[in-house]
Amino acid sequence: MNTRLPEILCACVIASPLIARGADEDRFSMEDYYKVDKVDAHFHLNTKDRNFVELAVEDRFRFVNIVVDSAGEIALRHRHQSTLALHAARPDRVAAASAFSLKGWDGPDWDAKTIRHLDATFAKGAVAVKIWKNIGMVFRDKDGELVMVDHPKFDPVFAHLQKEGIRVIGHLGEPKNCWLPLEQMTVNNDRNYFRKHAEYHMFKHPDMPSYEEQIAARDRMLEKNPKLHFIGAHFASLEWSTDELGKFLDRFPNASVDTAARIGQLQYQSERDREKVIAFLHKYQDRILYGTDFSMASDAKPEDAHARARKRWLADWKYFNTDAEMAVPELDDPVRGLALPKSVVEKIYHRNAVRLFPGSWKK
């Protein structure tokens, strides 16, 4: 007979609050949101106005402010002007990512002109380059052929970026839902987006490259540039499967991914296998950047934009840091938070961005 059983039981009762407190101390709370330095590594502030950035100081957020070639050459020029001006005004809060135009693609010197343009943006402080889904999904050459990201004409540009150590943020392809009918899509935000943007709903365009062809073109480009620091925007368009994301990150050791506009797909998976998603985030904690894909137009009121951004930021913080059950707009059913340890959250929200964009956010 174990005469120490009452003593052991008593010790367990006394220790259990201490164990619980220790677990809580290893995780951030909702109150910690305003105490922890954070980077939104996928943001679009299309304005020279500093007010939004000043409002976000209370949230302890800094930004990678990204230019996108989505509206023509004139808009691209204006976006560069505002993005670089905002960086110059608040280099301690805003890092800049530039982009390039495909205008003049069929000319013999497109690559040289593009490199000169990008170098000019780097001289003004840009630390990364964004490539967008118009490559592979929209832009065609003079013969009417879609230009994929592994086209040889891009080779000198990517080789230059690789040599200079410039990060490339790539939104290539779309979420896998894009190739499914609306009723089969897994999350509401994809369903709503492709209902409004039928031109990108590839299920309706069977003559266009498949999802697999888009991913393969991206991977061939990375194989040609093994030392390129590539950040796969939107979970590298592999948002539907942590297994596939893991394979991608294992295959390309210089690649990272951001969470922008795809946390709903992560929640869809954690709703079905929470522990698997937690294990993925633990294993690849050094390769994941928090981002939202939030966009603020030049004519938007900073206070209104900040209120919308904070709502998103707080919801994501709750998901990653607590084990509370919550309603999210991307899903019809509630999802339980992941309650990640502080060490993992600090990397996803801050340390990885500081490491990947060296020299950023300094006065």
Indicate residue ranges for each PLM-predicted region.
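Bacterial N-terminal signal peptides that target proteins for export
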Residues: M1-L9
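Hydrophobic h-region of N-terminal signal peptides that target proteins for export
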Residues: A11-R21
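An N-terminally biased module of ancient metal coordination in phosphate/nucleic-acid-related enzymes
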Residues: G22-R93, A112-K113
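H/E-rich (His + Asp/Glu) clusters that bind or coordinate divalent metals
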Residues: A23, P206, S210-R220, N225-K363
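Active-site gating/metal-coordination segments in enzymes
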Residues: E25-E31, Q81-M202, P206-P209, S256, ...
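Hydrophobic faces of well-ordered beta-strands that scaffold small-molecule active sites
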Residues: V39-F43, F63-I66, V94-S98, V129-I131, ...
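Acidic-and-aromatic substrate-binding clefts and catalytic sites of carbohydrate-active enzymes
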Residues: H42-R50, D69-R79, K103-A112, F139, ...
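Generic structural signal for hydrophobic
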Residues: L55-A56, L86, T121, L161, ...
